[in-house]
């Protein structure tokens, strides 16, 4: 039995953090209704074996998974097709480095980082350099360029910037 586990204690989410996650999940849910894919809020965990052999449990703020049978117990063991993290002062560094690296190594095709204070969305797309996965910032969405906000790998899914941030003062 391998007990080489890694647990990261994270502070509780702010109300703004939860509002953005709820708004995102609500927008995407209906658009995936006739699909094999599902959108999940931040109560779903993924367990992966990292390249160094340690098992890592990660709970994204939101994810879209099209292989929902890939579970072990209460955890998904496959990689989702999309993950989203909402920044907070206590998680920003980890979301931008640790989680981003884990998601990249698990080859998750698309990663969004949302800054609720600045009302900015960073859109990262996975590509390969010398056969190694790497995220590239393909867009930064803010109030001034908010039109046409779509997921790269789910182009039929429309995200309304104003709805995403509704309820945030």
Residue ranges and their predicted role:
Residues 1-169:
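Gly/Pro/Ser/Thr-rich low-complexity, intrinsically disordered segments predominantly at protein N-termini
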């Amino acid at each position: 039995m391998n007990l080489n586990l890694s647990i990261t204690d994270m502070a509780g989410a702010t109300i703004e953090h939860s509002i953005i996650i709820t708004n995102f999940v609500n927008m995407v849910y209906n658009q995936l209704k006739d699909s094999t894919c599902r959108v999940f809020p931040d109560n779903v965990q993924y367990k992966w074996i990292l390249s160094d052999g340690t098992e890592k449990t990660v709970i994204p703020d939101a994810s879209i998974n099209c292989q929902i049978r890939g579970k072990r117990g209460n955890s998904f063991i496959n990689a989702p097709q999309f993950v989203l993290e909402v920044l907070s002062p206590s998680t920003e560094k980890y979301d931008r480095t640790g989680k981003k690296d884990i998601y990249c190594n698990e080859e998750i095709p698309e990663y969004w980082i949302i800054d609720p204070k600045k009302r900015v969305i960073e859109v990262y797309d996975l590509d390969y350099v010398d056969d190694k996965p790497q995220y590239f910032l393909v867009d930064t969405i803010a109030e001034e360029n908010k039109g046409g906000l779509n997921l790269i790998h789910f182009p039929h899914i429309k995200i309304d910037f104003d709805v995403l941030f509704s309820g945030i003062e």
